[in-house]
């Protein structure tokens, strides 16, 4: 974490390795070049993902400070500092050996940006430091956005549920994704601090979780996998993709328990939009504009493959096998040209598995491949759930059956909470399809209630 501050605040940065010295900017340029090559052919292993995490954070702060210095140099008014919540979200991309340094390691950097924090005091516990920081973020911003960062493994002792673990990056909901929703409409945050452990917010319970998927897709090497001739075909293929296929089929089975959907949409239509957080309606999917017809076709092909043999309307397993073997499996000439003898042997071992056939189908057509990619992006580390009101949604992996779904004044996303004593433990933000634009938000404030996070 300290290196982020050193890079962002330093006027001239160098990197030393033995007797060699390299300017920081040249190192970054070289790493970016390698990253681009990795994206094309991956000759050096899984480099690109780690590059993004290690470089984007200091680059973010460098950019903020550069703009601030430029405006000051030309006598322009100082820019409004970014909110502490956004800065902490970016800082969470880095790790600190000493958990207290997740905050104290960027103290000078925050000061340079015009953001004030309590003076560093290493005699305080990690929980106390993190709680003070979260409280400061809420009061300075007069908002509750810091709560979006809550999902974590909660390794810090005595940490209130509404306080993020600032030394663990969950990446569950980037801020630029949150802004496209408005589950509490244009309401403003209303909150009170009962004591150092409790935060009370104004909101409304709109249901509970009655069922959930069990398999959670983790952050694995599969995100870098491409169905191309230069892949390594071995038992690792099954290890990588088994949880994906298992989760996909669980989601289809869970959606199949619904006979109708509260919005009047078809159940399959609701599933289609839930798994990608309604992105086609919001005209955004990565850096691409969705073509609605291609999107619908992509989901149709996706669902046909992943639900093969599950329902009366699904394609049969025999049909899936026939289509895949007839179109997508490499023929002998291709095998001899692109695969080694060992690869050909390993391919024979996996090509008859359901996992291989489904993945072959998903990667064979562009609309299906694109839909599958966005599903992986949105559903990684998430569960699909069914609510007591018949809605489908996605939640952090810690969510359980019985957890409540609440809308909170001032927050764009619904939150998952769990009863604990006289209060509620905050689990994290959720996407609940059909209530993301304020459909369930009360018309009058008197219908709201105080929710106590402990």
Predicted features, each with a name:
Residues 1-454:
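Acidic/Ser/Thr/Pro-rich low-complexity tail/linker regions in eukaryotic proteins
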